[in-house]
Amino acid sequence: MSARLLFVSKGEASSSTRYRALQFFPLWRQAGFEPAHLTVSGGAGATLAMLREARRADVVIVLRKTFPAALLWLLRRCARRLVFDFDDAIFCNSDGTPSRTRMARFVAMARASDRILAGNAFLARRAAAFNPAVTLVPTCLDSGRYRVDAGKPADSFDLAWIGSHSTRKYLAEAMPWLAAAAAKVPGLRLKIIADFDLPGCGVATLPVAWHADSEARELAAAHIGIAPMRDNDWSRGKCALKVLQCMAAGLPVVSSRAGANAEVIREGETGFLASSPAEWAARIALLAQDAGLRQRMGEAGRRLVEADYSILPVFDRLRSVIDGLA
């Protein structure tokens, strides 16, 4: 009889749901499991459905959600095995400041779980303080979706940034070094793959609406990927997905020296880490002047993703955890 896996999240549009659950469903089925997803975003109906389906499942995997104490108690009673999967610093506020409420719910969720799946080493350490049953399962992607042979514009030199309005602040804070880089690189253009534009940022922009079926192609059509971010608990909880996407598309990456980005990027091999406007501008100028370096770094990044952050090797790690519970 196939083991039933119930994945609970705030919705299919969430990147956590897509990258840490839904993309694995074909592999789960091939392995003889029965995966199902349920959206729980408030309301008594969704809550009752979760509890009902939890009773029918062999393993319940909660993605990036915590619950009020009473609901968590009910879920724990209904679930034979409970797994908590998270890839963000959901125990603090989005500006990195502490939150007693978020931390209390995070601690309760961690302690109630049979196993915790953490998206990076920082998150794993935080969870292990409350439950030693932690496995690091990095956020990964299907590298086969990303082509590295897309044509690139000849009349501009494009920096690709991919994100959403919620992460717009990181790009806005990059305006000083974007202007400095534009002074060094003729034709520099910022390609924003998101749901907004950033006029007046000190460099020409090309806004491109984000779509799941076109993001890989749009990335590959740029010259460099960039990943500016702050260095606080919230950003340390990020799992370098944007960096991995750029690498999968064959782009060298320049990133802030912070969080999982600094762990994934191999300095001078797959990209560069920068800490100041001058350093950002210098790294971008160096890559703009050396097509061979861009190609070597892009190829090295692609190999790294295929070896360590692609869907098959990560699924093997994930399955070993679930096999031990189901």
Model-derived features with residue positions:
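N-terminal pre-catalytic "stem/leader" segment of glycosyltransferase-like enzymes
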Residues: 1-62
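Conserved catalytic-core segment of nucleotide-activated headgroup transferases in glycan assembly
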Residues: 12-27, 31, 36, 142-146, ...
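Membrane-proximal helix-turn-helix segments that form the acceptor-binding/catalytic region
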Residues: 48-56, 70-78, 98-116
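Carbohydrate-associated surface elements
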Residues: 122, 140
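Nucleotide-sugar-dependent
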Residues: 169, 212-218, 223-248, 255-263
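Conserved acidic donor-binding segment of nucleotide-sugar-dependent glycosyltransferases
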Residues: 266-278, 286-292
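A short, well-ordered alpha-helix in the C-terminal region of glycosyltransferases
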Residues: 286, 293-308, 314
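C-terminal alpha-helical cap of glycosyltransferases
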Residues: 311-326
